[in-house]
Amino acid sequence: MPFWVGGVVKSGLTMTTMEIFAWLLIGHAIADYPMQSEWVARAKQPGFTFDGEAIWPSVLACHAGIHAGAVKLATGSWLLAGLEFVAHAGIDYSRGRGLLSYNGDQAAHVGCKVLWAGWAGFA
């Protein structure tokens, strides 16, 4: 019986690049919507403070870490998880600074998933 190990079924079968991409999008949708509360969405914005302390860097890092975990599960790659962490934090930081619109933010995230799926699918 096959079992999952880091995004690849271990029974002689592997996922196609499109299947990896689909799992990456599912992970993104789950991490960016039901797993991101309204409080997290506000608290990860640059400049957010709580009781006089700037907590936004740690909240943004936690949010990016959840996304990195989803990438690790979908691809089995720690390298891609690390790249996702950096990219996701950078994209969300840019959005928080007003450099990206909502649609631009989501397009950048999906673009990263295309790159990760391509890398994982051909590695």
Predicted features by range, described:
Residues P2-A22, A68-L80, L115-A123:
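Helix-coil boundary and interhelical linker segments in multi-pass alpha-helical membrane proteins
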